[in-house]
Amino acid sequence: MTTVRIFFEKCGEAAYISLLDLQRVFHRMLKMSSLPVYYTQGFNPHIYLSFSCPLSLGQESLCESCEVKTEQESIEPQRWIDALQPLMPRGIVITKIAPAVEKVGEIETAAYEITMPASSAIALDAYNNAEHAEVTKKTKRGQ
């Protein structure tokens, strides 16, 4: 059994697909592709699928990843890409498939790029130059 890491972009309309819906998309696409994926051994078997560091709803990404276990000892990455990409919804593009070297929890860094209008530069500079920033936490009962 091999763990495969699928790298993909999630842009445009796909940025509004929630994590739970994204899991459903990948489950359906893996089933439709007939790739040799591993199913759990419980009463209701399902595909072993795990997403690493998912973004919030509405955020675009150029490098998301998920892991899926396969029944094979080795994989053909291009075969997987060719089988999955035509089934993906608009806005999700598979960029790379490779055997997972480390576990999802061992991923140490991520790079983020935030773009904002030029009119926000003054407010951003003021925030960055402030000695501290106060945040009011709101709970179900108020503040």
Where are these regions (language model features)?
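Detector for methionine-enriched segments
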Residues: 1, 29-32, 88, 116
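Active-site-flanking beta-strand signature of metal-NTP-handling nucleotidyl enzymes
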Residues: 3-9, 112-116
